[in-house]
Amino acid sequence: MPQKAQPQPRESPFKPARQQPGLACEECRKRKARCDRAKPQCGSCMMTGRVCVVNHNRPRRGPKKGQIESLYSRLGRFIHGSLCISCWKAGMLTVTEVLEEQVIEQMEHIYHPDFEPNSHPRHSQSHDRRQQSGPDSSPDTQHELPFLQSPPAARDADSAERALLPSPVSPVRAMTAQELSYARTGSNPTQNPGLDLILADLDQLYFDRVHPIAPFLHQQRHLSQREAESSVLARACLRSAMRTVAAAMSAQYRRFADSLYIETSRVVQELDTIERTPSLKQIQAVLLLAHYELLRMEENRALATVGRCFRLIQLARLQDTDPSTDAGAGRDFVKEEETRRTFWVAYCFDRFLTSRNEWPFTLQEEAIWIRLPVSESAFQIPRPPEQPMDYLHEAIASSGQKTLPPFAEYIVLATLHGRTMNLRRSALLLSTSTEASMFWERHRALSDIVEKRSALWSYSPSATTPLVTADPLTAFTCLLEKTLIIYLGKVGQTAREQLGGMSERRLIENANSAVQNLATSEQETLMNCHSHSRSFDIGTGGRGGHASGGLQRSAQTAAEFVALAKFMCPVNCFRICSDKSVRRLTLSFQMQYPAQQSFLLRMEMPPRLEKYGMNVGERGTGRIRAIDHASRLKVDERRAVRAYL
C-alpha cells in the first residue's frame, strides 16, 4: 500500500514588517529618512558609518497641559466677553466682527472706567443670529470660560427682548435714562465727560447720515439748545430718537440701538398720557422711531408706528398750518420751516411705504394747505425767501415753468407717483367706453406733467451733478423721475390688457351699429360738410347750423366707436368697415375737438389703409396718429392721419 505524502508547510501570506517596533534613531529623524529600527544599529547608520542613538525620553506632541485653557482665558479677557467661545471655536465669527467688538469695548473702558464689560454677556446682532443657528457649546468650554457664556434665555431672545432681561445697563442707555429722568424730575444728571463725547458723536452722526434723507431739523439750533432744553421731556425724547436711528446706521454704535429704542418707546408712551395736544417734537420722535423700525424690525411694526404718527399730525393739524397771508416780522421762520418739513417727510413716507402693497393713503392730497419747503441752504442759514414757496397744487399746475429745490421736487414727484398709483387702481376696473376715455385723459395729463418736469429738471444744477457725488435726496429724486416714467408706461399697459379682455362680440356689435348709423342717416351730411369745408363755420345758422348739428351727432357716434375700438382692439372690428367709413370715422372724431391742437389715437388698422399714407408693419397692422389741426384739414384731408408703428 503506497505511503501517503506528508503535507508541505504553506508559506505565510503576510510579509515580514519593513520596520522593527520601537522609536526611530536621531540621525534618521534629523535626515527625515525611514529608519528600520534594527538593533544595535539601524541599516541607514550602518551604511553611512554614523552613530545610531535612540532617545526614549522624547516629550509628547501637542500643547502643554493647561496651555489651551490659558489661551482661552487670555482671549476672553482681551475681547471683554463680547464673543461666545462656542461660536468662536466653530468659526462662526469673522475677524472683522471680532475687531469691531474689541474696539467698542475698549472705547467703553476709556470713556467709562467704572463700567465692567465682563459683568454681563454682550453680543452683536449678527452674532445672535448665528448663535441661534449654530451648534451648542461643549460642556468643557462652558466649564473653562463661564464668563463668556450667555444664559439660554438671552441666546434665544431677540434684540428687543434681550434688552429687557435683568442685566447691567449699557453706559449710553444709562446716560440717556439720566437725561430723560432729568427731563421728568428736574434733577441734574451725573456729569461724565466720556459719555458726553459718545452722545455728541451720535448727534453728529444723525446729521451726517439721517438728516440727508429726513431733513426736518435745524442743525445749529438743535445743537445750541441741547443743554438749554434738557428739562423738556419732548425735546429729550426727540434727542433719544435721533440717537437711536443714528446708532442703527453706525457700525460702531449699532449695539446700543436696541436699548435706546426701548428707552425712547417708553418715553413716547409717557408723552401720550401727558400731552393733550401733540407737540412737534413728539411727532418728530415718533417719525424717527418708525424709520428705525423699518430699518431693523418687521415692516408691519413700522406701518403701525407710522400710522400713529399720521394721526398725531392730523390732530396737530400740521397739514394746514400756513396762513393765507405772508409771514410777518415777528414769526419764527425756523420753527415754521421745521413744521413744514416734518409734515412733508411724513407725507413722502406715506406715499412710498404704502405703494409696495398698494394700500390706501392716509394723508390725502386734497386736505393739504401748506407750502413746499425752501432749499436746504436757506433753511440752515437761515434765510427766508423773498417770495414764498408755492403750494403743492400750484407747483404741479406750473410744471415746466420754474425749477424747485431738490426736496420740493422730490415731494412733487412723490405726489405724481401717488396719482399714478390711483390711476392704476382705476385701470383694473375699466369696463365701459366712457371709463376708458376718462382714464386715458388722466393718463395723458399725467404724462404731460412728468414730461415737462423731466425736461426742466434735466437742466437744473442738481440734476447735472453726478449721482456718486450728489446728496442722497438729489440722487433719489433723479431716480424717482425715471421710475415714474416707467411706472406710467406699465399703467398704460395694464389698461390695454384690461380693455383687450372685453367681449369681442360686444365690440363688433357696437362697431356695426356705429358704422350703420354713419352710412345711412349721416352720410349725406358728412359729404355735404366735406364739399364745403373751406367755407364751413360751425357757429353759423341756417343750413350751416343744420350741418353743425348733424356733424356733432355723427362725431359723438364716431367717438363712441373709436373709444371702444382703440388700444389693442380686435382687427375684425375694422374689417367690417369700408375704407370710406373708417376715413369718415376718423374725420368725425377729430371735428368733435376743434380747440385741441393734437391728440394721439392708437388703433389696430387693417392693411388696406396703406393707400391713405399709413405705414403698415410686418404683421399687417399699424398704429395711426390722428392730428386735429383745422388748417391742415381744410388744405388736405390726407394730412389728417399720420402713421406710427
From Swiss-Prot:
Compositional bias annotation for Basic and acidic residues: 113-131
Entry superkingdom: Eukaryota
Stored PROSITE patterns: ZN2_CY6_FUNGAL_1, ZN2_CY6_FUNGAL_2
SMART domains reported for this sequence: Fungal_trans, GAL4
GO molecular function: DNA binding; DNA-binding transcription factor activity, RNA polymerase II-specific; zinc ion binding
Main location class: nucleus
Alphabetically ordered keywords of this record: DNA-binding, Metal-binding, Nucleus, Transcription, Transcription regulation
GO cellular component: nucleus
Location in the cell: Nucleus
Any GO BP: DNA-templated transcription
InterPro entries: TF_fung, Transcription_factor_dom_fun, Zn2-C6_fun-type_DNA-bd_sf, Zn2Cys6_DnaBD
Renumbered residue ranges of the record's region Disordered: 1-21, 113-170
One Pfam family in the UniProt entry: Zn_clus
DNA-binding region coordinates: 25-52
Function: Transcription factors AN6788 and AN6790 act in tandem to regulate the expression of the non-reducing polyketide synthase pkfA from the aspernidine A biosynthesis cluster. They do not control the expression of the other genes involved in aspernidine A biosynthesis, nor do they regulate the expression of the highly reducing polyketide synthase AN6791 and the esterase AN6793 with which they are predicted to form a secondary metabolite biosynthesis cluster.
Protein name: Transcription factor AN6788
Organism for this UniProt entry: Emericella nidulans (strain FGSC A4 / ATCC 38163 / CBS 112.46 / NRRL 194 / M139) (Aspergillus nidulans)
